[in-house]
């Protein structure tokens, strides 16, 4: 699916390999009275246009499945790290009409785009305010962990959003 954005044309990145069944993540929502239904294709397009990005299909699959949430399988070991470098996802952000929701992509992008720059999209956070970020810049891809206490350095976590999902597991410290 070709999408025209800005002065250049981008192509939606396909799912390279089928990622795991999203039921396995055991995503749950907080009973906050919010509407957690999947975003419409029009809303996805509006969000992409507002930030001049193209969301990868594997990330859209998560939005359509649960539109964010808190995963039970929340632990990931970044590329090149060992068990001691394990990271945990507290929540995936949702995409809905509410532009002020602190768990929503609109607000998260408003806060983080000036820090991260164009083409980097926070999709999840840990419990301490650090962000799991999709790199959507041209000729780039992957998921990074933005460590705000260390001058916002980006640590490579996975080569794609699907690979991040595939690598999530239950933190053995909580079993």
Residue ranges and their predicted role:
Residues 5-128, 172-175:
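A surface-exposed partner-binding patch
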Residues 153-173:
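Compact, glycine/acidic-enriched structural inserts
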């Amino acid at each position: 699916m070709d999408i025209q954005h800005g002065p250049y044309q981008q192509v939606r990145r396909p799912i390279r390999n089928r990622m795991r069944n999203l039921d396995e993540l055991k995503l749950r929502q907080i009973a906050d009275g919010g509407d957690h239904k999947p975003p419409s294709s029009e809303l996805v397009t509006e969000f992409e246009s507002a930030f001049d990005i193209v969301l990868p299909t594997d990330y859209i699959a998560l939005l359509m499945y649960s539109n964010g949430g808190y995963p039970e399988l929340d632990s990931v070991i970044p590329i090149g790290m060992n068990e001691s470098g394990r990271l945990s996802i507290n929540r995936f952000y949702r995409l809905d009409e509410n532009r002020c929701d602190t768990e929503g992509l609109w607000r998260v992008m408003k806060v983080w785009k000036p820090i991260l720059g164009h083409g980097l999209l926070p999709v999840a956070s840990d419990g301490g305010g650090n962000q799991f970020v999709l790199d959507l810049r041209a000729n780039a891809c992957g998921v990074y962990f933005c460590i705000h206490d260390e001058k916002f350095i980006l640590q490579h976590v996975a080569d794609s959003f699907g690979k991040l999902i595939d690598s999530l597991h239950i933190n053995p410290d909580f079993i």
